[in-house]
C-alpha cells in the first residue's frame, strides 16, 4: 500500500499500524506544544517541513528538515513548533 504525506492534514494521523510498528504523520502549528510523554516503543522522528524544539529529558534540540531523532523506549520527550511543521513519527517494538 502506498501513502503520501500530502494526503494527511490532521494534527496527528496514523498512516500505518501493525502489532510491532506505528507510523504517524504529525502536523503542528507554530507555537503549538506537544506535552511531555513517553512510549514503550523505540521512536524515530523525521522532520520534513518547518522547525521544532525537541526536548528529550534534560536535552533540547532544534530540528529542521533533514534532521532525525532516535529515542529508546521510556524516554520522556516533548515538542514545540517554532514554525508550522510536518513530521513523521515511527514507533517500533524491536523486541
Language model segments and positions:
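A short glycine-rich, His/Asp/Glu-containing loop-to-beta-strand
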Residues: 2-32, 90
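A cytosolic small-molecule/anion-sensing beta-strand core signal
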Residues: 48-49, 64-65, 83
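Ligand-binding loop in jelly-roll beta-barrel domains
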Residues: 73-95
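Short acidic-glycine-tyrosine-enriched beta hairpin
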Residues: 57-73
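Short beta-strand segments in beta-sandwich/barrel cores
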Residues: 24, 33-34, 50-55
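Glycine- and acidic-residue-biased ligand/ion/polar-headgroup-sensing regions
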Residues: 41-52
Amino acid at each position: 500500500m502506498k501513502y503520501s504525506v500530502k494526503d494527511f492534514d490532521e494534527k496527528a494521523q496514523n498512516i500505518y499500524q501493525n502489532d510491532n510498528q506505528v507510523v504517524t504523520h504529525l502536523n503542528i502549528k507554530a507555537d503549538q506544544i506537544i506535552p511531555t510523554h513517553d512510549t514503550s516503543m523505540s521512536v524515530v522522528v523525521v522532520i520534513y517541513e518547518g522547525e521544532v524544539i525537541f526536548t528529550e529529558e534534560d536535552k533540547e534540540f532544534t530540528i529542521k528538515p533533514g534532521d532525525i531523532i532516535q529515542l529508546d523506549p521510556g524516554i520522556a520527550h516533548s515538542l514545540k513548533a517554532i514554525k508550522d511543521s510536518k513530521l513523521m513519527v515511527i514507533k517500533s517494538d524491536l523486541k
